[in-house]
Design a protein with these regions (language model features):
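Glycine-rich beta-alpha loop segments
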Residues: 1-63
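Glycine/threonine-rich flexible loop motifs
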Residues: 18-20, 111-115
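Acidic/glycine-enriched connector segments
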Residues: 23, 46-105, 109
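Glycine-rich, charge-decorated loop segments at or immediately adjacent to ligand/cofactor-binding or catalytic sites
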Residues: 45-50, 138-152
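Short Gly/Thr/Asp-enriched flexible loops that form oxyanion-binding sites at enzyme active sites
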Residues: 50-55, 113-124
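Short, acidic/small-residue loops that bind anionic groups at enzyme active sites
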Residues: 64-68, 104, 120-145, 163-164
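Short, conserved catalytic or adaptor-binding loops enriched in Gly and charged residues
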Residues: 73-76, 148-164
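A charged, well-structured terminal subsegment
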Residues: 100, 156-189
Length: 189
């Protein structure tokens, strides 16, 4: 059985081809494709273009989930464009299609994507979909959430359960580490 596994990558639309964030996302796309994953993104520029480009250069398949809301075309490295009507539909389709997630550096849009996917995992709306962040950009947020979830406040929940919830997002130092982590987690599922 050759079941396609898709990793959705969240990230900023801002990085240009010469930026370090673009290069990191391109490497991530390549590493994911080398692990046998198809790569899904928001389909536009910046990190979305870079991760798709890296995957295509490694002979991987790419998906771009775009929205009529944005007056832009999908980037040229997208094999399959999934066109949604609204921004919200786009967000939930990015999550629905995924077998796992990676968040790269980004702004408020990326923060929302990361937070919604994370909360859906936390509340078991979706299950068995590993999530990673690349680099140290998101680390302060991960640390703060872990502090809130695992703090010393009284709770009927066991500390082990709280720590498991707080650890739903793996912090990967490199694109290679993120791709390997997702492959390992999906092998277990």
């Amino acid at each position: 059985m050759n079941e396609e596994r898709i990793i959705t990558v969240f990230g900023s639309s801002r990085p240009a081809e010469t930026d370090a964030d673009y290069k990191e996302a391109k490497e991530l796309g390549r590493r994911l494709a080398e692990q046998g994953f198809a790569v899904c993104s928001g389909g536009y520029g910046g990190v979305m273009e870079a991760v798709s480009r890296g995957a295509k250069e490694a002979k991987g398949k790419t998906y771009g989930v775009t929205a009529e809301f944005f007056a832009r075309q999908a980037n040229p490295f997208i094999d399959v464009e999934v066109r949604m009507k609204t921004w919200e539909e786009r967000l939930f389709e990015l999550i629905r299609l995924a077998d796992g997630f990676v968040a790269c550096k980004g702004g408020t849009g990326t923060l929302v994507e990361l937070a919604v996917a994370w909360e859906m995992l936390n509340k078991s709306v979706i299950a068995g979909k590993p999530m990673a962040v690349v680099g140290d950009f998101w680390q302060p947020i991960l640390d703060r959430v872990r502090e809130v979830e695992c703090g010393a406040r009284p709770s009927s929940e066991s500390r082990v359960w709280k720590e498991a919830r707080a650890s739903l997002v793996h912090s990967a130092k490199t694109p290679e580490e993120a791709a390997k982590y997702l492959a390992l987690q999906l092998e277990k599922n």
